[in-house]
């Protein structure tokens, strides 16, 4: 019997990418589906959604409306992920042609969903931490691995706890087995995923070996033929000295750290319920630079959070100057349902928010120009992962710079030493030596 065709579109974070891989695995290995990039020939169309900001939610309905217009007769449409979790039945009301809704904490139910009319699985307390998913990966050379699900921080601006539920760590034996299998199949790098990865080990579904995130990194680094370990996202509150020292000293741990700042103002951080102060954040970031001089630090910043004054914004700019981030993901505050910040009275006007975001991004661009210029004539070890147009190939350094050289597909999955000849903001161009 010929395979049915599956089309999937993934929006949002790396955890969504891994969730999509899990659903692809379940459907291709258990339900006789094969992936297609042509939506018109698909028997099943999935969109895996993000709800961290308002814009992706609006995009969902425009996307599924487009799917309905081009899909073939009899094809099913499923809405999955975080937006599915928090909108639930509203999706059926606004888009009655959707066949099922599957929340971010319920992706293991995908085979049930495709067989049940108007199936809705949005239970954020459902526990998938020990579910044995079938295996599928978009990349042979890099493997995403979930180490926890959910988040219990309840930052006042964030909807994630309402869409992914409380935090539960995945048992070490499951993580280790998945990493080992990925390496045996050719992965050179594993990428550990969780909302707060360095809070790992605080809560399991059942009794399991006690270990924290630093221990997990050390244990996984013993896997033979595994060359690199990356992770996202750690929480600044849990960046103790042990964690920073393991990060700096373990040669398999990539020297790229995501440190979500959100705001440089201690008052705004308190209103956000982040759990740390500006002083704590700077202490951790500067200690990291001291322990690991070649580290690249990325961050998330929200401008115009309710009540943010000009002084508060200047505190954020001060952290930018002191830490000099290699990369920032910056946004205007986006009001999200079910969050405390959405009901705060002192919302910031759009003009002020846009001005602050522009000021932040323009200054960071200047800093980044200075940073990348210093990379010229340096030599980096690069893992090549992606073909580019014009007989070019790209990969990443240990500290997460994107590097492009002339080369063909025979370089995919290989490490090569590259000398940087021309450094741009987004890409470092170089030559293999």
Curated annotation (Swiss-Prot):
Top EC class for this record: transferase
SMART domains documented for this protein: Elp3 (SM00729)
Annotated cofactor note: Binds 2 [4Fe-4S] clusters. One cluster is coordinated with 3 cysteines and an exchangeable S-adenosyl-L-methionine.
Pfam family, one: UPF0004
Matches recorded under Gene3D superfamilies: Methylthiotransferase, N-terminal domain, tm_1862 like domain
Domain MTTase N-terminal: 4-119
PROSITE patterns (alphabetical): MTTASE_N, MTTASE_RADICAL, RADICAL_SAM, TRAM
The protein's required cofactors: [4Fe-4S] cluster
Alphabetical keyword list: 4Fe-4S, Cytoplasm, Iron, Iron-sulfur, Metal-binding, S-adenosyl-L-methionine, Transferase, tRNA processing
Compartment(s) where it occurs, according to its Swiss-Prot or TrEMBL record: Cytoplasm
Annotated GO MF terms: 4 iron, 4 sulfur cluster binding; metal ion binding; N6-isopentenyladenosine methylthiotransferase activity
Domain TRAM: 373-433
Protein's UniProt keywords contain Transferase: yes
Function of the protein: Catalyzes the methylthiolation of N6-(dimethylallyl)adenosine (i(6)A), leading to the formation of 2-methylthio-N6-(dimethylallyl)adenosine (ms(2)i(6)A) at position 37 in tRNAs that read codons beginning with uridine.
Protein name: tRNA-2-methylthio-N(6)-dimethylallyladenosine synthase
Organism: Campylobacter jejuni subsp. doylei (strain ATCC BAA-1458 / RM4099 / 269.97)
Gene (name only): miaB
């Amino acid at each position: 019997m010929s395979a049915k065709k599956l089309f999937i579109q993934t929006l949002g974070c790396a955890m969504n990418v891994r969730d999509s891989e899990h659903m692809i695995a379940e459907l291709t290995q258990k339900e006789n589906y094969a992936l297609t990039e042509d939506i018109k020939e698909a028997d099943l169309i999935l969109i895996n959604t993000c709800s961290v900001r308002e814009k992706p939610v609006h995009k969902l309905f425009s996307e599924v409306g487009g799917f309905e217009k081009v899909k073939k007769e009899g094809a099913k449409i499923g809405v999955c992920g975080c937006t599915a979790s928090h909108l639930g039945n509203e999706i059926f009301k606004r888009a009655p042609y959707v066949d099922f809704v599957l929340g971010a904490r319920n992706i293991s139910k995908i085979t049930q969903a495709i067989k049940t009319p108007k199936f809705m699985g949005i239970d954020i307390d459902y526990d998938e931490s020990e579910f044995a998913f079938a295996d599928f990966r978009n990349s042979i050379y890099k493997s995403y691995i979930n180490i926890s699900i959910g988040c219990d921080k309840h930052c006042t601006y964030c909807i994630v706890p309402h869409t992914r539920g409380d935090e539960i760590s995945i048992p070490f034996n499951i993580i280790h087995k998945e990493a080992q299998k990925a390496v045996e199949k050719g992965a050179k790098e594993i990428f550990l995923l969780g909302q707060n990865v360095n809070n790992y080990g605080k809560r399991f579904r059942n009794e399991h070996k006690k270990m924290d995130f630093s221990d997990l990194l050390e244990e996984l680094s013993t896997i033979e033929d595994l060359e690199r370990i990356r992770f996202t996202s750690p929480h600044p509150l849990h960046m103790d000295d042990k964690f920073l020292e393991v990060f700096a000293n373990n040669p398999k741990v990539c020297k790229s750290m995501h440190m979500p700042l959100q705001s440089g103002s201690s008052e705004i951080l308190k209103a956000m319920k982040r759990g740390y102060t500006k002083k704590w954040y700077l202490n951790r970031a500067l200690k990291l630079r001291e322990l690991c001089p070649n580290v690249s630090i990325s961050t998330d910043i929200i401008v115009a959070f309710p009540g943010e004054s000009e002084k508060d914004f200047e505190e954020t700019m001060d952290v930018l100057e002191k830490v000099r981030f290699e990369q920032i993901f910056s946004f205007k505050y986006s009001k999200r349902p079910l969050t405390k910040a959405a009901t705060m009275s002192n919302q910031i006007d759009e003009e002020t928010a846009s001005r602050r975001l522009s000021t932040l991004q323009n200054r960071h661009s200047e800093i980044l120009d200075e940073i990348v210029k210093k990379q010229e004539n340096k030599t980096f070890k690069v893992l090549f992962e992606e073909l580019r147009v014009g007989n070019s190939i790209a990969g990443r350094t240990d500290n997460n710079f994107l590097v492009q050289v002339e080369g063909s597909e025979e370089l995919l999955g290989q490490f090569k030493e590259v000398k940087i000849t021309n450094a741009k903001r987004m890409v470092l161009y170089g030559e293999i030596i």
